[in-house]
């Protein structure tokens, strides 16, 4: 399985093409639109979300809500393009009229300046920010929806939520209350902040409100949990086959993500071995299992069968309504950075995006191990493998 996305933030469309999805997978627009709506929701989002109503269209690879085995093309229309049609016109030459909203004062923390240098976009840094914008993650969530649908066929569930926004934190001890991810999902999706309880929800809202009043932005952390993965996906034989490494790459590849950990993560660095390693047990029904999950579901780059637990660190959004020091790339004079419409925080949306990226990497791993042209054949292979593992 592989995919590519295309599109600019204020261009006409966002597009994704997916290859490698087996034939016979039932997938509807509603399956994808539900995930796109989750991405748009969340406390601290900006005015752009009031303009857009993200809905997907399948252009290829799906017939009668069933995949054909051929490349799947999806697109989402950018409603805001109506306000930018001249400025983002692909088929018209540059004129004084359609270059009015040039960006010449790069924002600290954004791709503006370095991207302009790399691609020689000396005339207008908008050529950088239109693609480097997190608007592109719309299509990663859409691809993730397809991946989640495939994973659900073999009993794998994936869910993301917010750990903290600034100093306001969810109590992770709350996780022990839930028997499965569906119970957790009902709770966290019931809060605008995707927090674990009402107390954390209110505290996070207070932080976001204060940040907005201060014309500032704020970051946080999100966590993704996946359950039901077969044992032994990924491999120890080469660095580039380790599944946790692939997930780490996918998480840090999301806009604004600056760190990733698995299980106990960085806290494990302050502990001793007998406090961290997940002891091994066996019973006739379950086969081998672990007594804890401090390593986040991975050993040697391979899934252990325990829950996969991934956390990502999200920096504050670099577009500030009280802009920071910058330099005009034309005059080289000191100026405040450009202002683009933005969110106060995108941590609530980041939980959904991280969930999608984990799902994509897990789906890739499943299809690498159980390569099949049809979804039913894939499920048969998984069932045989699970039984083999159980009897080991």
From Swiss-Prot:
Entries under Pfam families matching the protein: Chorismate_synt (PF01264)
Record-level GO BP terms: amino acid biosynthetic process; aromatic amino acid family biosynthetic process; chorismate biosynthetic process
Claim: Lyase is one of the keywords in the record: yes
EC number: 4.2.3.5
Protein residues bound to FMN: 131-133, 255-256, 300, 315-319, 341
InterPro entries: Chorismate_synth, Chorismate_synth_AroC_sf, Chorismate_synthase_CS
Pathway field: Metabolic intermediate biosynthesis; chorismate biosynthesis; chorismate from D-erythrose 4-phosphate and phosphoenolpyruvate: step 7/7
Gene3D superfamilies cross-referenced by the UniProt entry: Chorismate synthase AroC (3.60.150.10)
Reactions that this protein is recorded to catalyse: 5-O-(1-carboxyvinyl)-3-phosphoshikimate = chorismate + phosphate
GO cellular component terms, semicolon-separated: cytosol
Cofactor: FMNH2
GO function term, MF aspect, one: FMN binding
Keywords attached to this entry: Amino-acid biosynthesis, Aromatic amino acid biosynthesis, FAD, Flavoprotein, FMN, Lyase, NADP
Organism superkingdom: Bacteria
Cofactor binding note: Reduced FMN (FMNH(2)).
Binding site for NADP(+): 39, 45
Subunit structure: Homotetramer.
Family per record: Belongs to the chorismate synthase family.
Purpose of the protein: This reaction introduces a second double bond into the aromatic ring system.
Name listed for the protein in its UniProt record: Chorismate synthase
Gene for this chain: aroC
